[in-house]
Amino acid sequence: IPGFVIQGGDGEHGKKSALNAGRVGTGGPGYKFADEPVKGDYLAGALAMANSGPNTNGSQFFICTDDLTGKLPRNYTLFGQVTKGMDVVAKIVSAPRNSRDLPDKPVAMTSINVLPDEA
């Protein structure tokens, strides 16, 4: 969603060879876990756990496309930051999409690099 986030991580429907666009984003891993303390801000490139309410974390995540500090409730656990590749995030968010804000053509992350924490 331009000016907001890109979201992914559908554990049920995102891995099927024939994607059903009406179901993508509705799946989950079959488990939920508790919220964790939020440390940091929802800056552009922030990687956070998506959920549907308190203690409903699962497999879905989002990446902020803009600085959303103060615009999102602080119940989405932050667990990363895009350090390279915001140009890819911009391409995903600008892709043609349907009325449910799903891309017309499926988008998949095929690799990521996890860097050591600099703290």
What are the roles of these predicted feature ranges?
Residues I1-A119:
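Cyclophilin-like peptidyl-prolyl cis-trans isomerases
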